[in-house]
Regions:
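C-terminal, flexible cofactor-proximal segment of oxidoreductases
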Residues: 23, 34-147
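Glycine-rich loop(s) and the adjacent beta-strand/alpha-helix scaffold that form part
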Residues: 1-46
Length: 147
């Protein structure tokens, strides 16, 4: 199994290996601006979590639009945080490739919950702006440089 289909990411010409990223709320990857993934529950219907993630990303995009932000990036400020595999699943096809996937941290918002009720309340009613997210607005010059 290939993490995110084997896509190789880079930001401003610098490679960002997926195994070095942390999952912010299980949907954004640290260090990758404007990037979200939908990973479902391993203990319940996969689509329940994917639906919550999609709703939350739409809330985030609306927030960015209202405040004229063009970039949102998840930043891990706790470099000494203990990590573990993002997917807590013991199937052979996952176990063989788990080192290629993002990690999760040992505290919020980097800890992946496998709890639909908790996630529903958190994703639908939490504040969008927190200390782990940075928002930026690109200037015309910035945008031209990245074309």
């Amino acid at each position: 199994m290939l993490a995110l289909g084997g896509i190789r990411f880079s930001v401003d010409g610098q490679s960002t290996p997926i195994p070095e990223t942390l999952g912010y709320r299980g949907m954004m990857l640290s260090g990758l601006p404007n990037m979200a993934v939908a990973l479902g529950y391993t203990n319940a219907s996969w689509t329940l979590k994917c639906d919550l993630t999609s709703e939350h990303v739409c809330r985030l995009l609306s927030y960015m639009d209202r405040h004229n932000f063009t970039h949102c990036i998840a930043i891990n400020h706790h470099k000494d945080m203990k990590t573990s595999p993002l997917l807590d699943f013991s199937s052979g096809y996952i176990s063989r490739s788990i080192d290629e996937f993002p990690k999760q941290g040992d505290r919020a918002p980097w800890r992946l919950r496998q709890n639909y009720l908790f996630d529903t309340l958190s994703f639908r009613f939490s504040r969008l702006k927190d200390s782990a997210l940075a928002f930026y607005s690109a200037t015309s010059r910035d945008t031209a440089l990245h074309k």
